[in-house]
Design a protein with these regions (language model features):
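...captures the hydrophobic TM-helix bundle architecture rather than a specific catalytic motif
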Residues: 1-325
Length: 325
């Protein structure tokens, strides 16, 4: 508990340093921007805040790993441990050494492993394949974290390693998706709010993953790297997988935590609006990228196709905002 408290309470001062520095050099902090746009202490405060966050995440990950390994029942082998615990274990191991996007997505997948059996009214299709998929994602996570950086001057060998590592995540992701679909197949499904969010999350996870497979190939990545394709892919993954899985889990556990039942009608309206808005925003951004719209801009020339698609993106964003309200 003390280590956990230390890790948690390091987050507010780190966030304060990052925000109060007002560093204006994008979230990657490329040197050109960091020198021109953020002179003075802004960049130093931003970097120091990230260092504190890094220490916090390392301490939190150590706490999770030790807790899971030491506090589980002695007669419970790792192979039989609940898949949600496996999700936390593997994401913590990845965070200790490398922090790919998988580290944020794995807990959301673990949430779905709690939701699908409950509302399909049957056990998970294959516990062992879920364990294998989490393990594989942990391994390839160490060889995929630089797949955002093909265009930054890495050697051909380095780019090849990270490309293969990223593509190796496809079988693991497919195993999770197949597991969820096979669990639902033949089950007596109760389409309550949590499983609707989980199903939507899997659909968007598959869509984002399909785009990621294409984008992980070096030839296409150099074309789409500085375009809205990357913006659409990344945020479809974050919104579609992480947020949808987490919100579904919140709905699932809300009655257990509060002793009160949520409104099924409002929950389903929340899901439908969020799903429609997400599709409108991030699928359209993929198309914008293919039409050549660059990212990191605050304005764009009056190209008719760009204008029309950005209107669609704005409509989708308002729909998401209304759904979350």
């Amino acid at each position: 508990p003390k280590l956990n408290a230390v890790a948690f309470w390091m987050i507010p001062p780190a966030g304060a340093l990052i925000w109060l520095g007002f560093a204006d050099f994008t979230w990657y902090a490329y040197p050109t921007y960091s020198v021109i746009s953020a002179p003075g202490p802004a960049a130093d405060m931003w970097i120091f805040g990230l260092k504190i966050l890094g220490v916090s995440s390392i301490l939190g990950s150590i706490n999770f790993v030790v807790t899971i390994m030491k506090c589980k029942h002695p007669d419970l082998p790792l192979s039989k441990m609940p898949l949600l615990a496996w999700a936390y274990l593997t994401s913590s191991l990845i965070t200790l050494v490398a922090v790919p996007t998988f580290a944020a997505a794995i807990p959301a997948i673990g949430f779905m492993y709690e939701i699908f059996p409950r509302f399909s009214r049957k056990p998970i299709f294959s516990h062992s394949s879920g364990v294998a998929a989490f393990t594989l994602l942990t391994i390839v996570g160490f060889a995929s974290w630089a797949h955002h950086m093909y265009a930054t001057g890495m050697s051909f060998t380095e780019k090849t390693v990270f490309m293969v590592g990223t593509l190796a995540a496809v079988p693991a992701s497919a195993m999770h998706t197949f597991n969820f679909l096979a669990t639902m197949w033949g089950g007596r499904i109760k389409f309550a709010t949590p499983i609707m969010w989980a199903v939507g999350g899997i659909a968007l996870f598959f869509s984002a993953g399909a785009g990621g497979v294409v984008n992980s190939a070096m030839p296409l990545d150099f074309i789409t790297h500085d375009s809205y394709w990357v913006v659409g892919h990344f945020h479809l993954f974050v919104m579609g997988t992480i947020l949808f899985g987490t919100v579904g889990f919140v709905y699932y556990f809300f009655p257990y935590v509060t002793g009160r039942m949520y409104s099924e009608v409002l929950g389903k309206v929340h899901f439908i609006l969020s799903f429609v808005g997400t599709v409108l925003v991030f699928f359209t951004q993929h198309i914008l990228g293919l039409f050549g719209m660059p990212r990191r801009i605050y304005d764009y020339p009056p190209i008719p196709e760009w204008i029309q698609m950005n209107i669609i993106v704005s409509i989708g964003a308002f729909i998401i905002g209304i759904s979350m309200a």
